[in-house]
Amino acid sequence: MGGRGIDLAIVGAGPAGCGLAAALRLQGWGGAITLLEIGRGPGGRAATRRSRQDPTLAINHGAPLFNIRGGPEPALLEPLRSGGWIEPFPGAIHSLDGEGQLGPAIDDGFSDGSLYQGRGGMEQLSRGLLALAQGSPGATELRSGCLVRHLQPEAEGWTLTGADGAPLLQCRWLVLSGTLLAHH
């Protein structure tokens, strides 16, 4: 088990968790960060699944793209673009009705603004954010394949316990970046 040397534990390494780690590093925060992810790597529900039988078949699920609209561009956008992690979305957005008919995009605001996708799959957004966090001063660690089963508040922070009941780590601060524990 990791000791109290971990300042911040982030449960979930999707765009929210990796984005938080990258934003903290961009702001100059030097505390030790550990991200815990149940999946094989970063991405969470913004990922691309590939067929084992057909390597050309790839399906984005969850968040197939993201948009930036209104206000100034987020500071993390340019390093993600220039690092090759994301690219403009070149396609068109359509809707599919209950009859299976293709129609125009629904006017819900989600397809407005500048649209981006991960280059090579949506998990590249999270991989890029994680790379930005790891390339900055301060320790940033990703623990993949790590199920957090229980959160125990302590006098000076938190103890996180795994599926087998054994403590995973202790930390000063804790962020839950998704609905993760609701599934178990």
Region locations from a protein language model:
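A short helix-to-beta-strand connector/capping loop
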Residues: 31, 84, 131-141, 155
